[in-house]
């Protein structure tokens, strides 16, 4: 995947993006852009609208206000260019497929669901597995892998798709230290190749490691900007609804 040439449209553009269910806003007024090679952390408490916003970017839920554009188009028109990595524990671990077969699923948005994967597709899938350190587990049944390994397989599936935009939902939840390091390295490679990354996460330390911008949400946008100037105790307090302080290791603690 070649890097995006300078001067093009942002990979992701949100303009007052709003989603409501039964007239009740779930997330509203989100503004921001994500450029090629950039990574943005979505941070907020449970129920803040992070997953809903990701679903809206995927074109799975309609906006009730504002706009979302992916590569200058509506999300539905750009689906082949967008990959999504859910939490590993949202998938059925008993589904009888191998790690390689899961990764091959990432090729279907490019080749279509009717065509069978060819040699080039299998090579892309094998390369993606190698990038997350699981080349030797290609034939292992997905359900026999550890939680961290399953999360790496799901990222490999996204890598095989060669996306321009990668969306992740809590990718580091419950993963071991090795998997965490391999996930961070793989995300860095994707960004270097020109992909934009948006991830929902509760881990502020990992947000600092993986992202250069942050979007703070609690049903509406609290802040959007460089992580060093936006992830402040004041804005975090506004996001989480209580007095907080940020320790040097990126951990939020309540003020006495």
Positions of PLM-derived features:
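The feature captures the beta-strand-to-loop junction immediately N-terminal to the Walker
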Residues: 43-45
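Conserved ABC transporter NBD signature motif
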Residues: 63-78
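Conserved ABC ATPase "signature" region
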Residues: 104, 119-137
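Conserved ABC ATPase signature
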Residues: 141-145, 149
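Conserved catalytic motifs of ABC-family nucleotide-binding domains
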Residues: 162
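Catalytic Walker B motif of ABC-type/P-loop ATPase nucleotide-binding domains
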Residues: 166-170
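ABC ATPase nucleotide-binding domains
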Residues: 229-256
């Amino acid at each position: 995947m070649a890097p995006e040439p300078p001067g093009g449209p942002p990979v992701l553009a949100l303009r007052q993006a709003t989603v409501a269910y039964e007239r009740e806003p779930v997330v509203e007024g989100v503004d921001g852009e994500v450029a090629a090679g950039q990574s943005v952390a979505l941070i907020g408490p449970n129920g803040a609208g992070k997953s809903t916003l990701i679903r809206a970017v995927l074109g799975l839920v309609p906006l009730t206000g504002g706009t979302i554009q992916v590569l200058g188009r509506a999300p539905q028109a750009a689906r082949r260019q967008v990959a999504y990595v859910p939490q590993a524990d949202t998938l059925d671990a008993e589904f009888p497929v191998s790690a390689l077969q899961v990764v091959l699923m990432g090729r279907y948005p490019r080749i279509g669901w009717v065509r069978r994967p060819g040699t080039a597709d299998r090579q892309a899938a094998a390369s993606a597995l190698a990038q997350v350190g699981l080349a030797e587990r290609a034939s292992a049944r997905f359900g026999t892998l550890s939680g961290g390994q399953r999360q790496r397989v799901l990222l490999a599936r996204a890598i095989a798709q060669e996306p321009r935009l990668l969306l992740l939902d809590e990718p580091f939840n419950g993963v071991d230290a090795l998997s965490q390091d391999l996930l961070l390295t793989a995300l860095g490679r994707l960004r270097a190749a020109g992909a934009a990354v948006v991830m929902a996460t509760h881990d502020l330390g990992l947000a600092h490691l993986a992202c250069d911008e942050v979007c703070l949400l609690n049903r509406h946008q609290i802040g959007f900007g460089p992580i060093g100037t936006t992830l402040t105790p004041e804005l975090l307090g506004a996001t989480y609804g209580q007095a907080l302080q940020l320790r040097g290791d990126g951990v939020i603690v309540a003020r006495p």
